[in-house]
Amino acid sequence: MTTKTRVPAIEGWFTLDEQAPILLGSRCTSCGNFAFPKETFFCRNPECQGREFAEAPLSRTGTVWSYTDACYQPPKPYEAADPYVPFALAAVELAAEQMVVMGQVVPGVGVDDLHIGTEVELVLDTLYEDDEHEYVVWKWRPTATAPAAGQEARDAGRQAGRRPGCRHAPVGQVGTQLRRVRTRRRR
């Protein structure tokens, strides 16, 4: 049995430390704004004219800011298993950097297991393999305390009259909220 070499699916975006992988972003030397993936041309802060950046390791943990599922296979160059298996995606807020980073959620954790505010940590997982290599990417994994908190949030949502799986508006109020937004824009 030969062992395949683990390599990053995308070079330079994260470390391959199995115990404590880190996303590699950049930080503007003028204003301190973080970016991921690394910025090399101009600062993403619209009030800054900075064009010099330092590599910046980003936080390994964060909280779910938003999430969804990928029911349809992403287009090439994405390498998917055959047959395609849907997966959850999470936009994770990194508090120290004041930014949100998108990534897949580990297999076995779906949208029903997530909620806004779920604590997650960065891990490495295989995206695909060939004869010689195992190509890895970062993924988000809920921490040990997340399932109980997720159940509490779902229970609270049901008590507030929210639809199962929808964290945004109580049943019957979606149209009302949209009308208010449209009315405000006309003024």
Q: What are the roles of these predicted feature ranges?
A:
Residues 1-27, 137-141:
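A broadly conserved sequence feature marking short terminus-proximal activation segments
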Residues 18-59:
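Cys/His-rich short segments
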Residues 62-64, 105:
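Conserved hydrophobic positions within beta-strands
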Residues 67-73, 127:
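Short, conserved beta-turn/loop elements at beta-strand boundaries and strand-helix junctions
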Residues 81-100:
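OB-fold (S1/OB) nucleic-acid-binding surfaces
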Residues 98-152:
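Well-ordered alpha/beta subsegment
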Residues 181-185:
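Short, intrinsically disordered C-terminal tails of secreted or membrane-associated proteins
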